[in-house]
Regions:
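Accessory RNA-recognition modules of RNA-modification enzymes
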Residues: 1-201
Length: 201
């Protein structure tokens, strides 16, 4: 039906609705109900059984597994609509209570639908417990597991090259990532910035 901030899809089940994070308008999904509070159900997305007709955007090979982006499967115009509706609902809930009239002017889109990030913070970790070194983004819904996003669509080729080179180097010299539970290891984050005008990294 719609997506509320932050990424909370409102899913119809017969005459009822449930909040299922990371679901998109038009998708058919399987989910498990985690809790029901004040008559409102909240669920965890298990599987997208049928993609939305809106999902015609270009995605990377890890889309859905990686938690780095949610709306990339939608064309950029649809992404903007979803985000604009979210912002307007948030503002409505506050500004409609005041006496003065206000006008929502919309949001301004980026000139680039892909490779638009000029700063990224990648995390070191492993893709599964005791797995090989990974450098990239957190898996969707996970605080610990990391996926190496070698073909990420929201950064350009320079970022992808740096990501792969740094990961390969530290894997080769066997420097471990920092383990939150045991407080062992060293590597935590890789922050990369690129000046859009000069290309300086």
């Amino acid at each position: 039906v719609r997506v509320d901030f932050p990424n909370k899809g409102i899913v119809c089940v017969g005459d009822e609705t449930a909040v299922v994070k990371n679901s998109l308008p038009g998708q058919k999904v399987k989910f498990s109900v985690n809790k029901v509070r004040k008559g409102k159900a909240e669920g965890r997305l298990l599987e997208v059984t049928e993609k939305s007709p809106l999902e015609t955007g270009r995605t990377c090979s890890l889309f859905g597994l990686c938690g780095g982006c949610t709306y990339l499967s939608l064309p950029y115009e649809e992404q903007l609509k979803v985000k604009e509706e979210q912002v307007k609902r948030l503002l409505d809930s506050v500004l409609n209570k005041q006496e003065e009239a206000w006008a929502f002017e919309g949001i301004k889109g980026s000139p680039k639908a892909y490779e638009y990030r000029n700063k990224m913070e990648f995390s070191f970790g492993d893709e599964y417990k005791d797995g090989p070194l990974a450098l990239g983004m957190h898996k969707r819904g996970s605080f610990y597991d990391i996926v190496t996003v070698a073909d990420c669509e929201i950064v350009d080729a320079d970022y992808r090259l740096i990501l792969q080179t740094v990961r390969d180097y530290f894997a080769r010299v066997k420097v471990s990532f920092f383990h939150r539970m045991s407080h062992e290891g060293y590597l935590r984050h890789l922050l990369v910035r690129k000046a859009s005008r000069t290309g300086e990294i």
